[in-house]
Amino acid sequence: MFTNEPINLRNLIPSEHLIEHRMDRYMEIQMKIGFGNKFVVVVEMDTKYECLTDTGVVMVISKDTYNGKRLLITTYVGTIDKANAMFRSSGYPKLPSFVSTAILKANKKRIGG
């Protein structure tokens, strides 16, 4: 649904969980890595979407809308295993090299920064 659409954080509302329990991680991602410009793969689940961005960040977004906006449940830096699973479940046989490079860079910035 969201794949290759520009990421617009103004269309997302932070969840209570994100605000109360994950705000440090959210801010670290925003300051050190960035959320990216587009989603490279989106996995649709029962009540949510798991979206991998072009910077290697996973955003978990509710399917429900509130006043035209979706709830950002949480966000975290992806792993190669998670990205592989997301791509495979979306019908892609192989993880693109630019995605694995982005994930490795994101994890290095997060840990080393």
What do these predicted ranges mean?
Residues 1-113:
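Ribonuclease/tRNase effector modules and their secretory precursors
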